[in-house]
Amino acid sequence: MVIVEGVVIGGNRLGRKLGFPTANIAIDDDLAVENGVYSSKVVVEGEEYVAMTNVGVRPSVDGTKRLLETHLFGFEGLLYGLKLRVELYDKIRDEKKFSSVNELREQIAKDSNQIKELMANG
């Protein structure tokens, strides 16, 4: 397990448009975590949530700066400016460039289902 802590910053809100709002945290390029999608847990203000986290440059939206984006299952509300503790567990796939927003949305939904199942089974 790798732990990343940081303050939530604003993003382009694409995750929200896709039905998976994310909390974004700026990370150092030298963070010793491979780019990809991870099962995770996030602690915010003492509450723990199962989460889906992407570490990388977001090639489908022509991103260039490395970023951690995490979607907290069951969380409602805004996280901007709050400090999060993100615990990365299993890498489920590499980061990849998708040919369309719909293809990206479909893959995120698959990732979500896989992570929920993985975390439910321990």
Regions found by a protein language model. Give the residues of each.
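Phosphate/ribose-recognition catalytic cores of enzymes acting on nucleotide-derived substrates
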Residues: 3-122
